[in-house]
């Protein structure tokens, strides 16, 4: 984030989860809300406020650059699948995708993991790193 020459784009509603999510505990719709308040961020970080399903398509039409890195912290299947389908044409060999809640909790195979498996063939990516629940892939 400190490289002021590169613009980092983020998408957030600041309203929390748009549907319930069960990890190790129950997280109801709206959990993780920031009460629509945007945090203070460096000048090179631009936030597109609103639900990603309502903001991403127009952003991608206006910004046709290739996507080098995408951190997906959408928790649930539906928004993750939506984003993956929309950004796929702008990915290239070497693009990195980081999934924040990829595995290691109840029903994980029905969420971000499922969205990845339904959007990409096995030979289109490789796993490059794993964290507690996170996974990173590189587009081939």
State the predicted function of each range.
Residues 1-140:
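S-adenosylmethionine/decaboxylated-SAM
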